[in-house]
Amino acid sequence: MVKLAFPRELRLLTPAHFTFVFQQPQRAGTPQITILGRLNSLGHPRIGLTVAKKNVRRAHERNRIKRLTRESFRQRQHELPAMDFVVVAKKGVADLDNRALSEALEKLWRRHCRLARGS
């Protein structure tokens, strides 16, 4: 059985990790959310989240977006390529309900899988 934990090794923790992704990212996005990705040499994917107060005013909305994004990543982690991902929430993401946000994330994960196979 595949383990679906979300340990510390699967997170981008330092500013240097985020900068690495921002330097030469592969982009996949919708009007409300963008996922930047860059191949890593670790053999497993990692994720970092940026949900700015400027774009999502209420803390409980920011927390909901981060929670759903982490859960989506956790469930797909074994299907994703060995990349570092940064999820950037844009204006309007708070207007999406849980189902719409989950579907948007699934679509973006699939797009990143295709991009990684193509490169």
Swiss-Prot record:
Reaction catalysis annotation: Endonucleolytic cleavage of RNA, removing 5'-extranucleotides from tRNA precursor
Keyword tRNA processing: yes
CC per GO annotation: ribonuclease P complex
Keywords: Endonuclease, Hydrolase, Nuclease, RNA-binding, tRNA processing
EC code: 3.1.26.5
One of the Pfam families matching this protein, by short name: Ribonuclease_P
HAMAP family noted in UniProt: RNase_P (MF_00227)
Stated name of the protein: Ribonuclease P protein component
